Amino acid sequence: MEDLQLVLFVLGAIAIVAVLVHGFWSIRRQQPKSLKDSPMGNFYKKQAERGEGAPKRVDADGFDADGIGAVRVRKANEAHTPEAPAFNPYLKQEAKAQPQPVEPVQVEPKPLFKQEPSMAQPDFSLQSPTAKEQHRGPKASRQEPVLPGHSANLAQAHVGQSHAAMVAQKAAEEQRAQVQMPTQTALFDEEEAYEEEQPQVVEQPDDDLGEPRDVLVLHVVAKEGQQLNGAELLPCFLTLNFKYGDMNIFHRHVDNAGNGKVLFSIANMVKPGFFDPDNMEQFSTQGVVFFMTLPCYGDALMNFSIMLNSARQLADDIDAVVLDGQRQPWGEFTKQDYLHRIRANA
């Protein structure tokens, strides 16, 4: 048994040593070789040692086998002399024959009237023949010199053309003004005729209704043991399009904004019968009165219908009761009686 253990121990040690040796060998093989150990490094080293003592071979132009020549030193202050251009006798002869152009006289006549921007004016600006030829491009042929007399003739021609253009423009404007004047006169005549044709509106005075012959009354009273508060009445009046006015009471007008004739009114049921809008929060009453006089402005049936609906709406908003002129509950019989009174006073 001891021999078997010894054998296994020896085999294990051998295996461990083999693994370590194989690992070091693998690591060393993967490392890159240095330039000294590479075969090309020895080759370059030998070439360098061999070339130090041997003379370089150069060709007839002074370049060696690699195409490298000897070093040349140039002076820094050596100036570059441009080459003289080739002599051209034709250009010299043409330069002598070319005279210097004479600048023409620019004549700017003062305009007789203000020009309109919409009309395009012709361009009569003078240019010397030399400038025109330069604008068109160079020519191989010789150019004729410009004489002072020729420039003066051109200036006179320019003045004549400008004067003719201004005269033509003035004539066109006069003709246009003559065309516009009858048109404007016709427009003024049409406006005057239209004003004459308009009928003059004469405000007619409103028909006087005379003395009232009957009064339709509706009461809106609080329930037994209760009061109507002014803080609740005021917003209800404004919602129903009533406006505070004459006799310190609220009125309903033809226009909902409070303009026009009065259709019917609301008064306090308790004496003195008026309201104080500034102290409505401290105000309380047993009820209010809707009343409409007959005859009235507009349709009496329509006005009464509006008054009845307003009274019912107010009673619903403040939890009150609608009564007739005798302070009796409103019913169908009372309604028919009111309609009969309206027809009788129509």
From Swiss-Prot:
Q: Which Gene3D superfamilies match?
A: ZipA, C-terminal FtsZ-binding domain
Cytoplasmic compartment spans: 28-346
Keyword check for Cell inner membrane: yes
Q: Main site of residence? A: membrane
How does the record classify its membrane topology? Answer: Single-pass type I membrane protein
| Gene Ontology terms: cellular component | cell division site; plasma membrane
Q: Which InterPro entries match?
A: Cell_div_ZipA, ZipA_FtsZ-bd_C, ZipA_FtsZ-bd_C_sf
Question: Where is the chain membrane-spanning?
Answer: 7-27
Localization in the cell: Cell inner membrane
Residue ranges annotated as Periplasmic topological domain: 1-6
Region of interest called Disordered, as start-end residue ranges on this chain? 116-146
Note whether Protease occurs among the keywords.
Answer: no
Q: Name one GO biological process term.
A: FtsZ-dependent cytokinesis
Q: Give the keywords, sorted.
A: Cell cycle, Cell division, Cell inner membrane, Cell membrane, Membrane, Transmembrane, Transmembrane helix
Outline the subunit composition: Interacts with FtsZ via their C-terminal domains.
Its function?
Essential cell division protein that stabilizes the FtsZ protofilaments by cross-linking them and that serves as a cytoplasmic membrane anchor for the Z ring. Also required for the recruitment to the septal ring of downstream cell division proteins.
Q: Which family does it belong to?
A: Belongs to the ZipA family.
Query: What PANTHER family would the database entry show?
Result: CELL DIVISION PROTEIN ZIPA
What protein name is recorded for this chain? Cell division protein ZipA
Task: List the source organism.
Answer: Shewanella sp. (strain ANA-3)
- Name the gene for this chain: zipA
